């Protein structure tokens, strides 16, 4: 990324990640059992608004992704009033500093400040941002913090805002999302522990990982070139084949892990840009 893009990342410098190595099986990692509902007051937490909806006559419920507390729901009292200071602050795709109080699953927003330093999304980049938000809502459980995922979401928005190719940005985000929510599998070796070879063909078992292509594989498993898998492992999408096959693979995996639940924004992207 450019120096300008790097500057955009400074407001929310994430703490060092201490995640475990990626596992070969997609069995989800146990949810953190920390009793987050016992926390009464949190001040100035880095956050992004993922979604909001009306609550009673003058308020909103905002679904937010926070760096250290995961995804939580907050009541923004009076946010729908015409002259509320919150109306211009609680915007999607903008870095915020939020404070809240309460012990229930629905906390009360007590403060919100716009941090700034990020360009707004527009056009295709805006649609991609909504797609990323929908994935976060679908895959991230309440109060299950993933600081590395929070930081990569920030990077994703920055890359989109600076006009980087959406296909590459989304594939990178999808892989980090699956890794952080417990579905990580290596792409550079097979389930038999053999190194993936660039000139061979493979299938992807959603429960175990990369397998040699063969007649015993279900027909709906995507057939992927070894070169594509190796490129994806290195986050390299300059080959046209890698772009096309990685899209097929990630669409298959996301659909499988979501139990076939459709993504509204994914269909919009398919219809408009085939992303």
From Swiss-Prot:
Transmembrane segments: none annotated. InterPro entries: ARFGAP/RecO, DNA_rep/recomb_RecO_N, NA-bd_OB-fold, RecO, RecO_C. It holds the Pfam family RecO_N. One of its GO terms (cellular component) is bacterial nucleoid. Residues 1-38 are annotated as: Disordered. Residues 11-24 have a biased composition (Low complexity). One of its GO terms (biological process) is DNA recombination. Keywords: DNA damage, DNA recombination, DNA repair. Involved in DNA repair and RecF pathway recombination. This is DNA repair protein RecO. The gene is recO.
